[in-house]
């Protein structure tokens, strides 16, 4: 998207700080009620009218527009094709819109088992078949079940705040809620570009203050070998 220079943050760090400071509602207090299976939003419907009411008059544009997607766990068993149940939730292009959406959807710890929540650059679908994702791969970080909320938020802020040196390589991120653990992955475009992937993986660990090794899997290998796919890169 095109924005005037005066509206842009002077650096990635400034933009990241701006994003954090623009949050109209902290999440340190009472948590939301547990969701029924397949739910993603709370009591307030996530629609344009509700979001518009909370936006400030002078928005802070992001470098890219981003779209939240949700894969409903209750719909997965009814779909014969993988990915058929993934649906877009909302596309945002400003700091204020991000917080309006983020504060109106449940965080990973409150999602139903087998739910998948995505945040991808606008017009990139979170599917292997998408032309931008087809030759890519993903880095993955594992968390104990229900302990990925902060990691998910920090990942989102780093992505939309353009904190990665090789940010053009990034397609988006996903959090997968499973019985024993939560998994957050960053999807990238060109899996064979080892230098770019290593840069993204190392910086991501720094942003999360994550000390364990993480691995990068090519999408092609994931399609062929499923859970038995092996890491091509480690950082």
From Swiss-Prot:
Domain of life of the native organism: Eukaryota
Sequence positions that bind mRNA: 78-83, 110, 128-129, 178-183, 223-227
SS bonds (residue pairs): 133-171
InterPro entries named among the record's database cross-references: TIF_eIF4e-like, TIF_eIF_4E, TIF_eIF_4E_CS
Presence of keyword Membrane: no
Biased composition regions of type Polar residues, renumbered to the chain: 13-24
Name of the protein: Eukaryotic translation initiation factor 4E-1
Species name: Cucumis melo
Gene that specifies this protein: eIF4E
């Amino acid at each position: 998207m095109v924005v005037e220079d005066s509206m842009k943050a002077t650096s990635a760090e400034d933009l990241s700080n701006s994003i954090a400071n623009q949050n109209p509602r902290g999440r340190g207090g009472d948590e939301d009620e547990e969701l029924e299976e397949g739910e993603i939003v709370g009591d307030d419907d996530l629609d344009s009218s509700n979001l518009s009411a909370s936006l400030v008059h002078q928005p802070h544009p992001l470098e890219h527009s981003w779209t939240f997607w949700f894969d409903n766990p209750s719909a997965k068993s009814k779909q014969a094709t993988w990915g058929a149940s993934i649906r877009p939730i909302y596309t945002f292009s400003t700091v204020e819109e991000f917080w309006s959406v983020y504060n109106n959807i449940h965080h990973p710890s409150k999602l139903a088992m087998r739910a998948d929540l995505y945040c991808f650059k606008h017009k990139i679908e979170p599917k292997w078949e998408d032309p931008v994702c087809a030759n890519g791969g993903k880095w993955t970080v594992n968390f104990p079940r229900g302990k990925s909320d902060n990691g998910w938020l920090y990942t989102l802020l780093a992505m939309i705040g353009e904190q990665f040196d090789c940010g053009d390589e990034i397609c988006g991120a996903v959090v997968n809620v499973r019985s024993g653990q939560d998994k957050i992955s960053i999807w990238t475009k060109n899996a064979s570009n080892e230098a770019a992937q290593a840069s993204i993986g190392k910086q991501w660990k720094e942003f999360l203050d994550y000390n364990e090794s993480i691995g990068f899997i090519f999408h092609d290998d994931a399609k062929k070998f499923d859970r038995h796919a092996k890491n091509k890169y480690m950082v």
